[in-house]
Amino acid sequence: MAKSKEDLPYWDKYVDIKENPEHFGIPKEHISRMHQLKEEGFIPTVIYDIGSAVGHWKVAMEQVWPEARTYLFEANEDMAPFYDHYGWEDYHIGLLSDTDGTERNYYYNEQNIGGNSYYKENSAAYSSDIFRVLNTETLDSVVAAKGWPQPQLMKLDVQGAECDILKGSTKVLENVEWLIVELQHINYNDGALLAADSIALIQSLGFELIDEKFASSDVAIDADYLFRRKKDE
């Protein structure tokens, strides 16, 4: 059951992260690279933020493309009252993956929500005993049901589930020009694909790797990778 503001003990922390994205998980290099895309003429009208957490990436991108409309996708139901508080109507709460209707254990930590995933983080912050059982959805199914517009830019930061979600997004991906994907370099989330295999899969979906590890808070663990839709020969 979704919580209210009064039920969330870390509300003020969520606000702090939202208001200071460069200090909480979005490196300056990431934002600078987006500004570079804009300078090169890329002006998206629709952006999908997959793994939106407190919306801090949305806030950062509004400084780059203020005219774009950003749609939030987040598995953590606790974020619903947070989004409502800020008047963000374009959001979906649900566990995205490559199938519809599959039960998965979603491991979560109220204080460190950035690591929530159905691939449990291999750290002391996450316990095998603390999870919610959620039913998966594909991005294609969600977007079709809601009738939302298709994106030109899509970002995925979902702690190891990136490629699963992409496999369930083949229709949406037909319209995506640029793709930002956080990929892992070590077994940080148990069972998640590592970067090399992830890159191969993303390339098979019609994208080429443009910038490898273009931004990271800790490159030993993971980094952001930038892909562009392959141009027709």
For each predicted feature, which ranges?
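Phosphate/nucleotide-binding beta-alpha loop and adjacent structural elements of enzyme active sites
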Residues: 1-233
